[in-house]
Amino acid sequence: VGFKAGVKDYKLTYYTPDYETKDTDILAAFRVTPQPGVPPEEAGAAVAAESSTGTWTTVWTDGLTSLDRYKGRCYHIEPVAGEESQFIAYVAYPLDLFEEGSVTNMFTSIVGNVFGFKALRALRLEDLRIPTAYVKTFQGPPHGIQVERDKLNKYGRPLLGCTIKPKLGLSAKNYGRAVYECLRGGLDFTKDDENVNSQPFMRWRDRFLFCAEAIYKAQAETGEIKGHYLNATAGTCEDMMKRAVFARELGVPIVMHDYLTGGFTANTSLAHYCRDNGLLLHIHRAMHAVIDRQKNHGMHFRVLAKALRMSGGDHIHAGTVVGKLEGEREITLGFVDLLRDDFVEKDRSRGIYFTQDWVSMPGVLPVASGGIHVWHMPALTEIFGDDSVLQFGGGTLGHPWGNAPGAVANRVALEACVQARNEGRDLAREGNEIIREASKWSPELAAACEVWKEIKFEF
């Protein structure tokens, strides 16, 4: 018989250093930490095998298919500078292994069982190259950056948001009031907190109604288009869709979803509904740190960001950069570009392992949120540029005079930074000066500067 039973080394079948990658292959870069005594080639081949066609022993049914056509291949291994026990294994997967238009299926294969594999101490997926042939099977973001600007009629500046706090405990009426005050003061958006779904103190339908009222009142008074991210995340897909449908019936511009806790299947369904019905979709990344925080195990956020662009979302939270380490800044800007741009070159200094061509799939606006305030505005404007959403929760609601003045302070600071930049000034060097000048004309901004002045910002 042509079948030899028994266990054999993975590297005999799955380590192929001479392999020329195809344009249609999905390429993955894994950071592998093998158990002591397991050679890199064997560990890399094991990853390729376990995340594609392999199993632990030779099986009779292997003879019924063409392994050459379907197997994953570890085609390159490189050491990691400064880490004795780690290396990067590059794996190529044939396109046929994956269902079209399913992020869920892609992840089930690539980051499925293999992460519990005994021969490895740890495994981290650092980056994925999605071939254009696979990209084209996804609808992607419901609308994208340009369409959003046109819908909102806001150009040439970042958009401003604010998460309504306290995140849990407000009644719907008081919640709506906070929304109105922020929008009236000058913000473009307010946001449901990611944990706000439909709890006993505020059921979703009541919240939607009072927020819609707040939006329309603020729009009428300011002459600007306003939005509130109504969180449609729910315990079942049916309930999630019910909430999205009600939002559409109210005529509001945008809804929101927690894509990791809600799951990619639910998210993609919601994204399709949003495109069909003209709703923008704001994505929150609750649970991402469970997956991406460990340096040697899990998945890097850039992979989750790519997956979201494929599954669909118009905004996604992407960290703030400010006050963090310099290296962190380059890495963050790397995946921010992966979200926004049509074509991104391989650049290891920014953590980008592969050149990615999105073939005109719409882009996603990165959202900077978490612990930022008016003194950060120049840096945020410089780092993120116009195509971003800057969200100040406490930085708006924590204003000593209240929500509306807090919103005014942020809007004045933003407009001052944008104007200064357009006049050719260096925001990195003159940032504090620009904010100080602007605060002479805005008592609201002056008060905000005073409250947060001791929180130093090292650029």
Swiss-Prot record:
Residues modified as N6-carboxylysine: K191
UniProt enzyme class: lyase
Binding site for Mg(2+): K191, D193, E194
Modification N6,N6,N6-trimethyllysine occurs at: K4
Pfam families documented for this protein: RuBisCO_large, RuBisCO_large_N
Location of this chain's protein in the cell: Plastid, Chloroplast
GO cellular component: chloroplast
SUPFAM superfamilies: RuBisCo, C-terminal domain, RuBisCO, large subunit, small (N-terminal) domain
Cofactor(s) in the UniProt record: Mg(2+)
Entry-linked PROSITE patterns: RUBISCO_LARGE
Catalytic activity: 2 (2R)-3-phosphoglycerate + 2 H(+) = D-ribulose 1,5-bisphosphate + CO2 + H2O; D-ribulose 1,5-bisphosphate + O2 = 2-phosphoglycolate + (2R)-3-phosphoglycerate + 2 H(+)
Keywords: Calvin cycle, Carbon dioxide fixation, Chloroplast, Disulfide bond, Lyase, Magnesium, Metal-binding, Methylation, Monooxygenase, Oxidoreductase, Photorespiration, Photosynthesis, Plastid
Record-annotated site: Transition state stabilizer: K324
Active site: K165, H284
Amino-acid positions noted as binding substrate in the UniProt annotation, renumbered to this chain: N113, T163, K167, R285, H317, S369
More details: The basic functional RuBisCO is composed of a large chain homodimer in a 'head-to-tail' conformation. In form I RuBisCO this homodimer is arranged in a barrel-like tetramer with the small subunits forming a tetrameric 'cap' on each end of the 'barrel'.
Entry-linked NCBIfam families: PRK04208.1
Subunit structure comment from the entry: Heterohexadecamer of 8 large chains and 8 small chains; disulfide-linked. The disulfide link is formed within the large subunit homodimers.
Role according to the record: RuBisCO catalyzes two reactions: the carboxylation of D-ribulose 1,5-bisphosphate, the primary event in carbon dioxide fixation, as well as the oxidative fragmentation of the pentose substrate in the photorespiration process. Both reactions occur simultaneously and in competition at the same active site.
Similarity comment text for this entry: Belongs to the RuBisCO large chain family. Type I subfamily.
Protein name: Ribulose bisphosphate carboxylase large chain
Name of the gene this protein is made from: rbcL
